């Protein structure tokens, strides 16, 4: 009896362990299953998130608005950056001219800016030889247009042979011969040419066989020289040859601080000078007066006054 009871006791003591082992296996299996489900859900969520990102990509970050660039200021041409003749300088020139006797007309232009100083620009005078300047320009332009031929014989010389002494030496003989060959008058269109230049009384101005006639102002002289400057700038053969003649003029009335293309006029009650001054800052100066004497080409007192005006003009324009 005792033996049988011992066996039964051993049997009963094994069952709890078996149950515990089974429970442990079930717990482990349940835990493993749970972990597998979590991993599967995570993969699915990641895949779904990736799919959504591809279907609806995130908008790119907007860049900050670019400021509108401020344009760089274009520098003004050097000759137009300031007024070449200030109110004070004009007053100084006025005072100098007011101190001088007789009738005076002055026209000064800074070529770069086009700004102009005038003093009694409408005062009129007999033109004397100043009319030779626009007359020579008229001849050269008509030659280029084929309306006349300056290579043609004029007496014993050609027209070109006479242009140089007409301007450089103010030859009245050359003016007589050229005026006989190609008269500059109302009938030939010379007056119309002067009208285009802006002359005050072009109808009475002429260069003809019997002489030079006309009533002009200091402004007329300035405008004629400006037209010549523009013509020289074209650089044509005629323009350069004519410019050479003006540069060769060696009279000494208006002071010029640099080489100048110039033309004077001198007769009774007429002493005039006009010049294109090729300084670093080029300018034109024209001065007409009644200081002339038909017995003296360059009266000393008149010359000295013109020198003073030319000197002050150079100081004003060139800021010397």
Listing of model-derived features with the role each one plays in the protein:
Residues 2-94, 100, 116, 124, ...:
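Structured C-terminal helix/loop/strand segments within mature extracytoplasmic catalytic/sensor domains
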Residues 147-190, 199-200:
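Conserved catalytic neighborhood of penicillin-recognizing serine enzymes
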Residues 175-231:
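Mid-domain, small-residue-enriched loop/turn segments at the edges of structured enzyme/sensor domains
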Residues 101-124, 147:
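Short, conserved catalytic-motif segment at the N-terminal edge
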